[in-house]
């Protein structure tokens, strides 16, 4: 029997890695969470061969000072907490200080970082049995980049248990979807084997968040989802719940506590209990986010932090259950009209005449009792609905206690309820149903008939201007009042293209990969220029790398794809040495190089017509005034 001894640092870290680093997705999780804790607004994830060859995480967070780089790769070293009180009120993702040390013990890890206070970046990596950390200068913008190369290279047994590259990347992609839902304010990109797979742009408003919800959970879930928003004391529940009338069974089951994704049987039970009397769905889909006082939840109960323990679990369960039940009740009864109003709507439709010729204008009075002219085809289309309304009332009379209603879903359209009665189905029978209109849908149609007819006067509408005559293929002949002028078509094309590009620069241009990358001899300081202006280069849709003193141009925005890239890009990089161009200057640069070939006058005029009046006037001021009056006087005098 061997005596008791202290384990070598590398072996101790490898043992700890057994809990922290299960597979490449675990590495991505730990490193991205560190980026989020550092206040990053953008995180770029680059994966090669499912993560077994390369995992590269780049962020624009606060960075790590040079003096702390060595500590960052040491065990039990963290900036997230310092006392037991901090642990009991933890809100950050990481707090144990084990991730980087554990990952570096089973891979070749390099950490490059720079803070805003530093003039240069520093790079650190650990090697050897004692895991000694070496720090050296490097080029890098504010933020951090972590490269994990050859995961499990020194633990062959662990490497053999990895699945195929496709399977491992699927786990990474699935984890990114989960974090993208709760951190809508972060711009995430995911690249696999050099190809961008995911690009989750920041969702700064509800409409943008719904787009992200559609990207992650799919359109069937997003279109039918019921929005949840409630608060009681220190508890706040928000998110989206699958409609009980959704025809699709969703596998979306995401629950977050203070922004941390967890697996919890408590919330699953609350959801099933809320739906027990509402739908046939055995396990409805949901994206729920619970905000709670951090003192009321213990996040340090699972090695991978997948579970938490609530101090008052029964209270939390009942709160979630009540919130979901309230949302489902509103979905079926309170969204459009109350039950008392539904009876009145039924009476209106039942007592209405059954032929289109008998439906008179008073039947579709507006709110101000003004008559509305309804086209005959609209009246004819209303007749079948009137008959359907009578059928609904008679059918509903025999089903007391059944609630019909509609719920406005996440996209503002109506989620149609379905019959809650359970039926048996044969093996070849479809589960789809032919449903009658609900009472709330009938009420909505009645409100639609009360809408005044469309009038162009009601909108600030301006028809497209007719294109003026073209002179010599270069000018538009502009006639205004008693003035005649020539407007250069190319100057208009340049101005409209600048407006188009500048509007797109706000969210970033999409680069197009070149069939054959362009290679140019690189200057010695170009790598520093690329690192310093990395965000700007990505914003333009450019992908530039330097290898063996050669600048490799892989992606460019469509505006300069046809230009001489071997000349245009190096000239632009030279200008970056002296100043960072403003968005207007970037737009002008791209527009100038995009208009080197043939331009279509009708397309340019159409773009010009869509500009605001003040911008049109600025462009029109470039027109060359023709002295036609003096010319006529000269002709008359002759």
Swiss-Prot record:
GO terms for molecular function: ATP binding; ATP hydrolysis activity; ATP-dependent DNA damage sensor activity; mismatched DNA binding. GO terms for biological process: mismatch repair. It comes from the Bacteria. Residues 398-435 are annotated as: Disordered. SMART domains: DNA_mis_repair, MutL_C. InterPro entries: DNA_mismatch_repair_CS, DNA_mismatch_repair_MutL, DNA_mismatch_S5_2-like, HATPase_C_sf, MutL/Mlh/PMS, MutL/Mlh/Pms-like, MutL_C, MutL_C_regsub. The keyword Flavoprotein does not apply. Pfam families: DNA_mis_repair, HATPase_c_3, MutL_C. Keywords: DNA damage, DNA repair. GO terms for cellular component: mismatch repair complex. Belongs to the DNA mismatch repair MutL/HexB family. This protein is involved in the repair of mismatches in DNA. It is required for dam-dependent methyl-directed DNA mismatch repair. May act as a 'molecular matchmaker', a protein that promotes the formation of a stable complex between two or more DNA-binding proteins in an ATP-dependent manner without itself being part of a final effector complex. NCBIfam families: mutl, PRK00095.1-1. This is DNA mismatch repair protein MutL. It comes from Shewanella baltica (strain OS155 / ATCC BAA-1091). The lineage of its organism: Bacteria, Pseudomonadati, Pseudomonadota, Gammaproteobacteria, Alteromonadales.
């Amino acid at each position: 029997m061997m005596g008791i001894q202290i384990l070598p640092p590398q072996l101790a870290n490898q043992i700890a890695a057994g809990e922290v680093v299960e597979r490449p997705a675990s590495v991505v999780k730990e490193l991205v969470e560190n980026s989020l804790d550092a206040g990053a607004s953008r995180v770029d994830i680059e994966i090669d061969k499912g993560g077994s060859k390369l995992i590269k995480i780049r962020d624009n967070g606060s960075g790590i000072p040079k003096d702390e780089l060595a500590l960052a790769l040491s065990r039990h070293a963290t900036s997230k907490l310092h006392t037991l009180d901090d642990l009991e009120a933890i809100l950050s993702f990481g707090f144990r200080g084990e991730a980087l040390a554990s990952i570096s013990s089973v891979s070749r890890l390099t950490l490059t970082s720079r803070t805003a206070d530093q003039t240069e970046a520093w790079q650190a990596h650990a090697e050897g049995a004692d895991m000694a950390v070496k720090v050296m200068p490097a080029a890098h913008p504010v933020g951090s980049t972590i490269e994990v190369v050859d995961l499990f290279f020194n633990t062959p047994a662990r490497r053999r248990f990895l699945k195929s590259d496709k399977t491992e990347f699927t786990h990474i992609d699935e984890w990114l979807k989960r974090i993208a839902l709760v951190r809508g304010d972060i711009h995430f990109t995911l690249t696999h084997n050099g190809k961008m797979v995911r690009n989750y742009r920041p969702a700064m408003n509800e409409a943008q968040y719904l787009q992200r919800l559609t990207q992650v959970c799919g359109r069937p879930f997003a279109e039918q989802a019921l929005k949840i928003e409630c608060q009681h004391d220190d508890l706040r529940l928000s998110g989206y719940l699958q409609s009980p009338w959704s025809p699709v069974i969703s596998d979306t089951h995401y629950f977050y506590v203070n922004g941390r994704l967890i697996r919890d049987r408590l919330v699953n039970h609350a959801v099933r209990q809320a739906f027990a009397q509402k739908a046939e769905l055995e396990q409805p889909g949901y994206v729920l986010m619970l905000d709670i006082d951090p003192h009321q939840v213990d996040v340090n109960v699972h090695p991978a932090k997948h579970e938490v323990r609530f101090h008052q679990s029964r209270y939390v369960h009942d709160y979630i259950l009540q919130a979901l039940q309230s949302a489902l009740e509103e979905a079926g009864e309170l969204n459009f009209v109350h039950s008392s109003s539904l009876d009145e709507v039924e009476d209106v439709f039942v007592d209405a005449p059954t032929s289109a010729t008998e439906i008179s204008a008073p039947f579709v009075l507006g709110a101000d009792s003004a008559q509305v002219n309804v086209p005959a085809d609209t009246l004819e289309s209303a007749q079948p609905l009137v008959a359907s309304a009578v059928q609904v009332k008679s059918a509903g009379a025999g089903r007391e206690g059944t609630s019909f209603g509609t719920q406005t879903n996440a996209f503002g359209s109506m989620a149609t309820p379905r019959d809650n009665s359970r039926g048996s189905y044969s093996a070849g029978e479809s589960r789809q149903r032919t449903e009658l209109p609900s009472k709330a849908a009938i009420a909505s149609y009645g409100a639609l008939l009360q809408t005044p007819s469309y009038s162009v006067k009601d909108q600030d509408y301006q028809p497209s201007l007719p294109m003026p005559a073209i002179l010599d293929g270069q000018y538009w002949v502009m006639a205004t009042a008693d003035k005649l002028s020539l407007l250069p078509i190319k100057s208009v094309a340049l101005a409209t293209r600048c407006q188009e590009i500048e509007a797109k620069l706000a969210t970033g241009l999409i680069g197009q990969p070149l069939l054959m990358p362009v290679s140019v001899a690189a200057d010695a300081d170009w790598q520093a220029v690329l690192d310093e202006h990395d965000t700007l280069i990505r914003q333009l849709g450019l992908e530039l790398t330097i290898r063996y003193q050669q600048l490799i141009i892989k992606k460019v925005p469509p505006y300069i794809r046809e230009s001489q890239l071997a000349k245009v890009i190096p000239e632009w990089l030279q200008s970056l040495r002296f100043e960072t161009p403003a968005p207007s200057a970037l737009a002008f640069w791209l527009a100038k190089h995009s208009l080197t070939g043939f331009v279509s006058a009708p397309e340019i005029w159409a773009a010009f017509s869509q500009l605001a009046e003040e911008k049109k006037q600025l462009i029109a001021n470039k027109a060359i005034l023709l002295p036609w009056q003096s010319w006529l006087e000269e002709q008359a005098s002759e």
